[in-house]
Amino acid sequence: MVFLLCFFLVADVSYGINGDCELPKVVGRCRARFPRYYYNSSSRRCEKFNYGGCGGNANNFHTLEECVKVCGVRSRDSPKEN
């Protein structure tokens, strides 16, 4: 049991994914179109979306650089590694 707990803690730290980054993309209930970035847990990349301006959650970043820094991943527009 202790081994499993340690394994999951190490796995979580090694992937470096902030819990906020696992939240779903939420456009919000208002109708603005602010360009923002969110971490897509399916593609494991930061991707652009249009934020409505109200509501939402913590998986909402003003810049691509901020998303990559917080979530520790490449962006969708980054060149693929060989």
UniProtKB/Swiss-Prot annotation:
One family name in Pfam for this protein:
Kunitz_BPTI
| Site keyed Reactive bond for trypsin: positions | 31-32
Oxidoreductase among the record's keywords?
A: no
Alphabetically sorted, this entry's keywords are:
Disulfide bond, Ion channel impairing toxin, Nematocyst, Potassium channel impairing toxin, Protease inhibitor, Secreted, Serine protease inhibitor, Signal, Toxin, Voltage-gated potassium channel impairing toxin
Q: Where in the cell is it found?
A: Secreted; Nematocyst
Where the record annotates domain BPTI/Kunitz inhibitor, the positions are 21-71
Any one cellular component term from GO for this entry?
extracellular region
Which family does the record assign?
A: Belongs to the venom Kunitz-type family. Sea anemone type 2 potassium channel toxin subfamily.
From the Swiss-Prot or TrEMBL record, give the protein name: U-actitoxin-Avd3g
